[in-house]
Amino acid sequence: MLTMNDAPFWKTKSLTEMTGEEWESLCDGCGLCCLNKLEDWDTGEVVFTSVRCVLLDGESCRCSDYENRRATVPDCIQLDLKKVHEIGWLPPTCAYALVRDGKDLYWWHYLVSGDIETVHEAGISARGRTVSEAHVDVDDFEDYVVDWPLTVGEKAGEKQRT
């Protein structure tokens, strides 16, 4: 029988109670946060593009210079406790949002599966679907608007790795 001490940290701790290491480990490596977004100034609506940050590795979906990212990308949004509660564009599969809302992580999250590849195998990540902002003029970002970052998790809990 599992006790609270046996349960994983994301089931027993709130985001505010997590250590720095636990907080960082919640990132599932999907890369969706690092896609450029456009905001309608009149309505405030935010849409995703398939244009990724220059530092996001398109294959691993991890930042290529995480420790120094703000030196290269000064407007990089560092997800913290305050922002998790304020940002309305977090993908529905985001572990930070799930834990914030008292939900469990999906089967494909590496903390559950034990394998960092399951986020890609489940089709949740940005792998193979993006272009670097280094190759797209900012005036052309509207040509890259996509909705899949908001729909990738619609069936995330239905199938499991075989």
UniProtKB/Swiss-Prot annotation:
InterPro entries: Puta_zinc/iron-chelating_dom (IPR005358), UCP006173 (IPR008228). It holds the Pfam family CxxCxxCC. Disulfide bonds: none annotated. It comes from the Bacteria. Transmembrane segments: none annotated. Belongs to the UPF0260 family. This is UPF0260 protein Atu0932. The lineage of its organism: Bacteria, Pseudomonadati, Pseudomonadota, Alphaproteobacteria, Hyphomicrobiales.
